[in-house]
Design a protein with these regions (language model features):
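P-loop/Walker A NTP-binding region and its immediately flanking N-terminal helices
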Residues: 2-198, 208, 216
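Extended, largely alpha-helical regulatory/partner-binding modules appended to the mid-to-C-terminal parts
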Residues: 86, 110-114, 129-132, 145, ...
């Protein structure tokens, strides 16, 4: 019985080998947000105030031991942190323009640098996890100039974990640099804030988002309607990563490498621009019943109410600005 079972198992193994198709990396699809992740400060859109401060610190070698990057999701906090780690550990020396080709730069880009320790605080909230991390700080970098600790969603740490960090943040080894990232600055203890240089990341403007999408679209040989990109940028609400996810989705939906305004409006369930002019006409009649009927039609069709109100406010603003040529620059 045992021999028969072993023979059957071996037979199944041979069948699996016969039908096994080796993994081919060229066949795997890489999402656009990862494929076009910026590799240097020059590749980034927006956050000029943050970039200039970091570039000055690198060029003048006035490095702080702890940084706090705060801002909404998808605005470049972890991306800039990784580029900053490259700048610190590039084999050409501390520089604001890392080579991108040395072993240190390549390892950081590929996410396998042993001296860039990335921690997801949301899944390691306990004080014991923090103590394990801090115990690691006492050891010298394995192959780099600095050990960089990138703690994402740091606001998720417990109060005990924050307290355990205080001493290390105040007097870290010369080779250790901490970069804390959060979307909720108000949850960070004041004692932590006082030990960090704090950089507030802004939402990415619609213009910068469209510029970035156009660059990627050109690299992917896509045909893009400007109105379609404008809707995507508005829907992303300043989060460039969200814009790239929506853009990626639309590339898959359209299929023919043509991103059309009509397809974007339909699939993102947002109002066509012409609809706002229809609403304006209804308002001009000052008939409350007609206005309520239009609103009911919009909501019953499943349109996002908040996005509709934001779009309506922008529409009326554009109309008022358009009435006076001197205010167009606004």
């Amino acid at each position: 019985g045992v021999r028969y079972t072993m023979l059957m198992a071996f037979g199944r193994f041979l069948l699996q080998c016969a039908y096994y198709t080796p993994y081919n990396p060229a066949m795997s699809y890489q999402v656009l947000a990862r494929k076009y992740r910026p590799a240097s400060f020059q590749d980034l859109e927006g956050q000029e105030h943050v970039l200039q401060a970091l570039i000055n610190a690198l060029d003048n070698e006035r490095l702080h031991h702890a940084y706090l990057f705060t801002g909404t999701r998808g605005v470049g906090k972890t991306t800039i942190a990784r580029i900053f780690a490259k700048c610190l550990n590039c084999e050409q020396g501390v520089t604001s323009e890392p080579c991108g080709t040395c072993s240190s730069c390549v390892e950081i880009s590929e996410g396998r640098s042993v001296d860039l320790i990335e921690v997801d605080a949301a899944s390691r909230t306990g004080v014991d996890d923090m103590r394990d991390l801090l115990d690691n700080v006492q050891y010298l970098p394995t192959a780099s100039r600095f050990k960089v600790y990138l703690i994402d969603e740091v606001h998720m740490l417990s109060k005990s974990s924050f307290n355990a960090m205080l001493k290390t943040l105040e007097e870290p080894p010369a080779y250790a640099i901490f970069i804390l990232a959060t979307t909720e600055r108000h949850k960070i203890l004041p004692t932590i804030l006082s030990r960090c240089q704090v950089f507030t990341f802004n939402r990415i403007s619609v213009a910068d988002t469209i510029k970035h999408l156009k660059g990627i679209g050109a690299s992917e040989d896509l045909v893009m309607e400007d109105e379609a990109l404008h809707v995507i940028a508005q829907k992303a609400d300043g989060a460039l990563r969200d814009a790239l996810s929506i853009f990626d989705q639309m590339v898959s939906i359209c299929g023919d490498k043509h991103i059309r305004y009509a397809d974007v409006v339909k699939n993102l369930n947002v109002l066509d621009y012409d609809y706002y002019f229809k609403i304006t006409d209804v308002f001009s009649t000052q008939n409350v019943g007609d206005v309520l009927l239009v609103f009911d039609e919009i909501l019953s069709n499943g349109f996002d109410g908040q996005i509709f109100l934001n779009g309506l406010a922008n529409h009326f603003r554009d109309l008022m600005v358009g009435r006076n040529p001197e205010t167009v620059k606004l």
